[in-house]
């Protein structure tokens, strides 16, 4: 299996997995044109589309892709049923694509119906988890997003986290504002800054490393608790997450 990223819009990534036979899986195609170009250039044969949620920058290219390749099966949560989904999937179910089983994980927060797909080592997490950050709470609650991130953080160490946006640099700038002396955060920030200066992608990321540098996955760590306690005493990790998310929204 080969993992490919296709840039779209200002900062989206459309992920494509292909096998040796050229069959491919497309994840969150917000725009059809760059996907069609990649299909033609690589002689891929699209077999399926995974949708994580209903936002237009993740589903906008579905109609055109299905018109061009009517054999495509489109998997997605209930909230994408009017966006071209032909196979609705929910938490705990599996999608069998390219000879692999992908587990469906419900991750409400960014939207209420958001889902992720996992087949070791690949995690397609849409707008739930970003490198160094997490998605905004457009529909769900902070508590829901906290629980969703806990689910993803519990996946195997070697999981390849495939995020849908290139937000890493700004996320790490925020992380530094919270934990300015953290060595892991400082090291990763320098690496990301160098990559982005060369217009290079910062993804996918390894989950084991992400747990060390993503403040939203560290709400139970004493260093972060101490920082938060300087402003307000919060007993529960989901409350600390809500505090962080609110800070990031204003950053």
UniProtKB/Swiss-Prot annotation:
Note on cofactor: Binds 2 Zn(2+) ions per subunit.
Entry EC number(s): 3.1.2.6
Residues that span the membrane, as ranges: none
Subunit description: Monomer.
Protein name: Hydroxyacylglutathione hydrolase
Gene3D superfamilies reported for this sequence: Ribonuclease Z/Hydroxyacylglutathione hydrolase-like (3.60.15.10)
CDD domains documented for this protein: hydroxyacylglutathione_hydrolase_MBL-fold (cd07723)
Class of this enzyme: hydrolase
Cofactor: Zn(2+)
Molecular function terms from GO: hydroxyacylglutathione hydrolase activity; metal ion binding
Biological function: Thiolesterase that catalyzes the hydrolysis of S-D-lactoyl-glutathione to form glutathione and D-lactic acid.
Disulfide pairings: none
Keyword Zinc: yes
Pathway: Secondary metabolite metabolism; methylglyoxal degradation; (R)-lactate from methylglyoxal: step 2/2
Similarity section: Belongs to the metallo-beta-lactamase superfamily. Glyoxalase II family.
Binding sites annotated in the UniProt record for Zn(2+) 2: 57-58, 127, 165
């Amino acid at each position: 299996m080969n993992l490919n990223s296709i840039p779209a819009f200002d900062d989206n990534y459309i992920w494509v997995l292909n096998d040796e036979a050229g069959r491919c899986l497309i994840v969150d195609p917000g725009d059809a044109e760059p996907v069609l170009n990649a299909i033609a250039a690589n002689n891929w044969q699209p077999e399926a589309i995974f949708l994580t949620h209903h936002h237009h920058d993740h589903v906008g290219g579905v109609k055109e892709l299905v018109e061009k390749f009517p054999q495509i099966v489109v998997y997605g949560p209930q909230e994408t049923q009017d966006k071209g989904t032909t196979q609705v999937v929910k938490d705990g179910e599996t999608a069998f694509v390219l000879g692999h089983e992908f587990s469906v994980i419900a991750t409400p927060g960014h939207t209420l119906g958001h889902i992720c797909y996992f087949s070791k080592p690949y995690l397609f997490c849409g707008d739930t988890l970003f490198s160094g950050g997490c998605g905004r709470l457009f529909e769900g609650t902070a508590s829901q997003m906290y629980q969703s991130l806990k689910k993803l953080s519990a996946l195997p160490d070697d999981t390849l986290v495939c995020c849908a946006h290139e937000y890493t640099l700004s996320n790490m700038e925020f992380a530094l504002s919270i934990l300015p002396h953290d060595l892991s955060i400082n090291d990763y920030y320098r690496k990301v800054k160098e990559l982005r200066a060369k217009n290079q992608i910062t993804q996918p990321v390894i989950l084991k490393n992400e747990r060390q540098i993503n403040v939203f996955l560290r709400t139970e760590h004493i260093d972060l608790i101490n920082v938060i306690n300087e402003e307000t005493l919060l007993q529960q990790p989901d409350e600390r997450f809500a505090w962080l998310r609110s800070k990031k929204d204003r950053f």
